[in-house]
C-alpha cells in the first residue's frame, strides 16, 4: 500500500514537468519538420547550389558522362534572365543524383546511362518513392455458385495416348540429361538465378520425375531471390515474370511445396520495385542497382508486355492474401481502360506506347503559368539533362517521335499481332477465366460483395486541362478526349466490350488469304497481317479520319491467337442483354482457320518455322483463285509491280467501321470555354457498337464522333529483277518463291503446338491430335537430320540462321512450353484440366480458385 502511495505522490510532483516536456518535444519536432519542408521547397524551385565531386563523394563507376572537374560549382550555375530561374547543369552526375530525389527521370528507353552506383548494403532494402495509399482489394470468389462455373473442356472423356506420352517423356529426359541443368545452376550461382531450371520445373513434375524434382527444389532453396546476383545488371521484368515467378508458382501449384511459394513471394516483391513510378506502371528494363530510382516508366515500351505480370500476381495475391500484387495489376488495366480511345484503332494498343502518360508542356504554356496549375503536372528531367514539365494524363500515349526517323514514317501507328500486343488480349481473357467471369479487371465490377475497393485518388489526380493547353490541342487539330467513360462513376468499358471490339478490328482489317502453292478443297487458309495507321481529327464534321495501310508480314507468334480465340469461344459473355459480343461459333471458326493455316505452314517449311515471314495476298479471293504461280510472280516483278518508294502513299476508298453506314463511336459535347475556344468533351455513351443517340445532356449541345477508315495503298516488299533468278530467289535459294521474306527460322518453337493443344482440349476432335502427331514426327526427323553425329548419335539443338548469335544451351521454352504442350495434348483430359487450371503466357500452370 505504501508503494502505491509513493508512486501516486511522485506522479503528482512530475506531471506538470512531464506536460512541459511533451510540449517542448512536439515544438522541437514540428520546427525540425518545418526546416525539412523549407529545404524541399528550395529544391523544388531549383534554389539549391549545384553539387560537384569536391563536395560529395561519388564513389563507384557512374555510367553517366563524367563531370568537368576543371569547372567550379559557380561555373555550372547560370541565371536565366528571361524567366528568373536558375539553370542547373544536370549532366553532372552528382547534381543529377541530387535533383533526381525530387524530379523523376523521363526517358524514351532504359539504358546503362541511368547509373549503377548504389552501395551493396542498400540493395537488399527498398523504400518506395511513390507508395500506394489505398490499395485495390483482391475480390473474393467464395460466393460463386456452381451454376456460374463455366466448362472449357467437353463432357466426353479424353483418353491418353500412351505411346506418344512415352516418346515425349523420353525426349524430355534426353534434353534434360544433355543440358545438365542441376550442374549448370550450381556453377552459375554467382552470376545468375537458376532461371532455366525453374522454367522447366513443372514439366519435370508432370513427367513423373519425383526424385529429380526434389533435387531441383533443394538447389532452388539455396538461392536468395530477394535481389538478383550482382552480375545481373539489368532485369528484364517480363522475362523474369514468365520464367521465374510463373515457374515457381506453377511448381508450387503441382507439388504444394511451400518453399516454392516463399521463393515466389521474394521474386514478386522484387518485381514490385519496378512499379515504383509516379503512375505505378512498371519499368520493363529495370536497372535495379541504379541510384537514379525516381523514374517514370519508359516512353517507348511494347504495350502487351505491360500486362505480363497479371496472372501470376493475381494468383499470388489469392494464395498469400496480400493485396499489393493484385493492386499492381489493377492499376495497369485501369490505365488500359483509360486509353481505349487514345489511338487510331479504338480498343487496340499499337506495338509501342508511351507508358509514362506524360504530355509535355510547351514553352509558351510554361510562360503562361500552366505548369503551376494542377497536381497532375510534375517537373521532370529528360534524357537531354533538361527540366521539362509533364502533365500526367492517366493513360498510355503515342511514343515520342524519333528525331532520326523519317517524319512521314513517324506519323504512323503500327499494329501487329505479335509478342508485343497479343498478351493484352490473352491476359484479359484468362483473367476473366480465372475469376469465372465474376469480376471484371477493366471496370472493377464484381458480382460479389467483396469487390475490389476503388482507390479514391484514381481519377481525381488527372485534373481538367488548363485552357492554354486546350487551345494548343484545338489548333493542332488533335481530338480532345476524356480519359474516362463512366456514368455515375461506373465504367462502361469492360473486358467484354474491349475484347469484342479489338477482335472485330482484327477480323476486319488484319486477316488475309495468301497466295499458296497448293489449295485444298473446303480449306480456307488465313493469316494475320499488320497495319500502319495515320489519323486526322476533323473538328468541322466531328470525325476521325484514319488511313490504314496493310502490310502482309506475319509473325509466327500470331499463331497463338488461334488457341486464345478457341478458349474464348468456350467462356460465356459477361454483360447485359444489350451487350454486344462475337458469337462463339465465329470465334471457333476463326480459331480453327488460324491453327490449320499455321500447321500447313509447318508442313511447308519442314518444321523450320520462320519467326517472321511475308506473303502475297490473294488477288482473286472472291472466286477462290488463290493458287500461287511462280511465272506470274516473275512477270509482275519484271513489270515493276513490286517496286515501292518511301512516300508511296496513294489512298484507296473510304470504308465504314462496323456495320452499315459506319459506327457512332463516342458521344461528344461542345463546351464553350471562357476565351471562346470550343472544347470537345466525351459524353458517357452506350456500349461500343450501339447507335443510341443522346440528344441533350446538362443543356449542352451533343454531337457524335465516328471513325472513318480510308484504305491506303498496301505496303509491298521492294523486289526487282536483281533479287530473282527465274522462279527462285537469287540470294536465298532455300526460300520458297511464294514467300517474300523469311526471318529467324526456329525448330523448337511452341506457338503452333500450343494452339493445337487448346483446340483439342476444347473440342475433343481427334484431328487435332493427328496434327500434333504429325508435327512431332516432323520435329524429330528434322532434329536427327540436322544434329546427327558418329555412330548414329544425335543431339537436340535449336536451329539458328547463318550470322545469328548461336546459343549452345537449349532454350528453356523447349522444356516449359513445347514439350509440355505435346505432353498434355496426348495425356488424359483430366491431367491439368482446363476446367480447373489456366496455362499462362509462359506455359505455366495456375489453379482456378
From Swiss-Prot:
Residues 1-12 are cytoplasmic. Disulfide bonds join 559-598. Its EC number is 3.2.1.-. GO terms for cellular component: endoplasmic reticulum; endoplasmic reticulum membrane; membrane. The keyword Glycoprotein applies. One of its GO terms (molecular function) is calcium ion binding. InterPro entries: 6hp_glycosidase-like_sf, Glyco_hydro_47, Glycosyl_Hydrolase_47, Seven-hairpin_glycosidases. One of its GO terms (biological process) is protein glycosylation. Keywords: Disulfide bond, Endoplasmic reticulum, Glycoprotein, Glycosidase, Hydrolase, Membrane, Signal-anchor, Transmembrane, Transmembrane helix. SUPFAM superfamilies: Seven-hairpin glycosidases (SSF48225). Its cofactor is Ca(2+). Pfam families: Glyco_hydro_47 (PF01532). It is a single-pass type II membrane protein. Signal peptide: none annotated. It is found in: Endoplasmic reticulum membrane. It comes from the Eukaryota. Residues 33-849 are lumenal. Residues 56-79 are annotated as: Disordered. The chain crosses the membrane at residues 13-32. Putative mannosidase involved in glycoprotein quality control since it is involved in the targeting of misfolded glycoproteins for ER-associated protein degradation (ERAD). Present with 71 molecules/cell in log phase SD medium. Belongs to the glycosyl hydrolase 47 family. This is Putative endoplasmic reticulum mannosidase MNL2.
Amino acid at each position: 500500500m505504501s508503494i502505491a502511495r509513493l508512486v501516486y505522490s511522485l506522479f503528482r510532483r512530475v506531471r506538470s514537468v512531464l506536460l512541459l516536456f511533451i510540449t517542448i518535444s512536439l515544438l522541437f519536432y514540428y520546427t525540425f519538420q518545418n526546416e525539412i519542408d523549407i529545404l524541399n521547397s528550395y529544391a523544388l524551385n531549383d534554389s539549391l547550389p549545384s553539387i560537384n565531386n569536391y563536395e560529395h563523394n561519388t564513389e563507384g563507376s557512374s555510367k553517366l558522362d563524367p563531370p568537368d572537374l576543371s569547372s567550379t560549382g559557380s561555373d555550372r550555375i547560370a541565371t536565366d534572365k528571361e524567366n528568373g530561374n536558375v539553370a542547373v547543369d544536370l549532366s553532372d552526375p552528382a547534381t543529377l543524383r541530387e535533383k533526381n530525389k525530387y524530379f523523376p527521370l523521363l526517358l524514351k528507353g532504359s539504358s546503362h546511362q541511368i547509373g549503377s552506383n548504389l552501395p551493396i548494403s542498400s540493395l537488399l532494402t527498398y523504400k518506395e518513392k511513390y507508395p500506394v495509399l489505398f490499395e485495390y482489394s483482391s475480390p473474393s470468389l467464395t460466393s460463386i455458385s456452381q451454376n456460374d462455373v463455366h466448362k472449357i473442356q467437353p463432357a466426353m472423356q479424353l483418353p491418353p495416348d500412351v505411346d506418344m506420352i512415352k516418346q515425349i517423356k523420353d525426349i524430355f529426359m534426353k534434353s534434360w540429361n544433355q543440358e545438365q541443368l542441376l550442374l549448370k545452376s550450381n556453377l552459375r550461382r554467382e552470376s545468375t538465378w537458376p532461371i532455366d531450371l525453374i522454367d522447366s520445373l513443372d514439366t519435370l513434375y508432370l513427367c513423373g520425375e519425383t526424385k529429380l524434382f526434389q533435387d531441383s527444389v533443394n538447389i532452388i532453396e539455396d538461392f536468395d531471390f530477394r535481389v538478383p546476383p550482382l552480375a545481373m545488371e539489368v532485369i528484364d521484368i517480363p522475362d523474369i515474370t514468365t520464367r521465374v515467378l510463373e515457374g515457381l508458382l506453377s511448381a508450387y501449384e503441382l507439388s504444394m511445396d511451400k518453399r516454392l511459394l516463399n521463393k515466389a513471394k521474394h521474386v514478386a516483391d522484387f518485381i514490385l520495385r519496378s512499379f515504383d513510378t509516379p503512375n505505378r506502371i512498371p519499368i520493363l528494363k529495370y536497372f535495379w542497382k541504379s541510384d537514379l530510382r525516381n523514374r517514370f516508366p519508359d516512353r517507348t515500351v511494347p504495350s502487351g508486355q505491360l500486362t505480363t505480370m497479371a496472372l501470376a500476381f493475381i494468383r499470388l495475391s489469392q494464395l498469400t492474401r496480400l493485396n499489393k500484387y493484385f493492386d499492381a495489376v489493377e492499376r495497369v488495366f485501369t490505365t488500359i481502360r483509360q486509353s481505349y480511345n487514345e489511338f487510331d484503332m479504338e480498343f487496340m494498343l499499337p506495338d509501342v506506347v508511351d507508358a509514362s502518360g506524360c504530355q509535355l508542356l510547351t514553352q509558351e504554356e510554361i510562360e503562361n503559368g500552366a505548369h503551376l496549375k494542377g497536381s497532375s503536372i510534375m517537373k521532370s528531367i529528360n534524357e537531354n539533362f533538361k527540366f521539362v514539365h509533364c502533365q500526367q494524363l492517366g493513360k498510355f500515349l503515342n511514343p515520342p517521335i524519333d528525331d532520326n526517323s523519317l517524319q512521314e514514317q513517324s506519323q504512323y501507328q503500327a499494329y501487329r499481332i505479335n509478342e508485343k500486343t497479343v498478351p493484352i488480349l490473352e491476359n484479359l481473357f484468362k483473367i476473366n477465366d480465372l475469376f469465372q467471369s465474376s469480376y471484371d479487371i477493366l471496370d472493377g465490377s464484381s458480382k460479389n460483395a467483396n469487390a475490389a475497393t476503388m482507390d479514391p485518388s484514381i481519377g481525381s489526380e488527372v485534373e481538367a486541362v488548363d485552357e492554354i493547353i486546350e487551345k494548343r490541342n484545338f489548333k493542332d487539330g488533335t481530338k480532345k478526349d476524356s480519359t474516362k467513360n463512366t456514368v455515375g462513376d461506373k465504367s462502361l468499358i469492360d473486358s467484354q466490350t474491349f475484347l469484342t471490339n479489338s477482335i472485330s478490328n482484327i477480323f476486319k482489317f488484319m486477316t488475309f488469304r495468301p497466295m499458296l502453292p497448293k489449295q485444298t478443297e473446303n480449306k480456307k487458309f488465313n493469316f494475320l497481317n499488320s497495319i500502319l495507321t495515320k489519323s486526322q481529327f476533323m473538328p468541322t464534321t466531328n470525325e476521325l479520319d484514319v488511313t490504314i495501310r496493310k502490310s502482309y508480314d506475319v509473325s509466327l507468334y500470331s499463331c497463338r491467337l488461334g488457341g486464345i480465340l478457341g478458349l474464348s469461344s468456350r467462356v460465356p459473355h459477361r454483360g447485359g442483354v444489350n451487350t454486344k459480343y462475337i458469337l462463339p461459333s465465329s470465334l471457333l471458326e476463326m480459331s480453327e482457320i488460324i491453327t490449320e493455316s499455321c500447321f500447313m505452314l509447318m508442313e511447308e517449311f519442314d518444321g523450320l518455322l520462320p519467326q517472321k515471314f511475308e506473303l502475297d495476298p490473294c488477288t482473286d479471293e472472291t472466286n477462290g483463285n488463290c493458287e500461287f504461280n511462280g511465272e506470274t510472280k516473275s512477270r509482275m516483278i519484271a513489270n515493276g509491280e513490286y517496286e515501292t518508294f518511301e512516300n508511296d502513299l496513294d489512298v484507296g476508298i473510304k470504308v465504314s467501321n462496323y456495320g452499315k453506314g459506319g459506327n457512332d463511336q463516342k458521344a461528344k459535347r461542345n463546351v464553350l470555354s471562357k476565351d471562346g475556344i470550343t472544347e470537345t468533351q466525351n459524353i458517357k455513351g452506350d456500349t461500343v457498337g450501339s447507335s443510341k443517340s443522346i440528344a441533350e445532356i446538362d443543356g449542352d449541345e451533343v454531337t457524335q464522333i465516328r471513325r472513318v477508315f480510308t484504305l491506303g495503298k498496301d505496303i509491298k516488299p521492294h523486289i526487282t529483277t536483281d533479287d530473282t533468278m527465274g522462279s527462285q530467289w537469287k540470294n536465298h535459294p532455300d526460300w520458297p518463291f511464294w514467300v517474300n521474306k523469311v526471318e529467324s527460322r526456329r525448330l523448337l518453337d511452341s506457338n503452333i503446338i500450343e494452339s493445337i493443344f487448346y483446340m483439342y482440349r476444347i473440342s475433343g476432335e481427334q484431328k487435332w491430335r493427328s496434327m500434333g502427331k504429325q508435327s512431332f514426327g516432323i520435329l524429330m526427323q528434322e532434329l536427327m537430320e540436322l544434329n546427327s553425329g558418329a555412330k548414329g548419335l544425335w543431339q537436340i539443338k535449336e536451329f539458328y540462321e547463318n550470322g545469328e548469335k548461336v546459343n549452345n544451351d537449349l532454350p528453356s521454352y523447349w522444356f516449359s512450353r513445347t514439350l509440355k504442350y505435346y505432353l498434355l495434348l496426348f495425356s488424359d483430359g483430366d491431367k491439368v484440366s482446363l476446367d480447373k487450371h489456366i496455362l499462362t503466357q509462359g506455359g505455366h500452370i495456375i489453379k482456378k480458385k
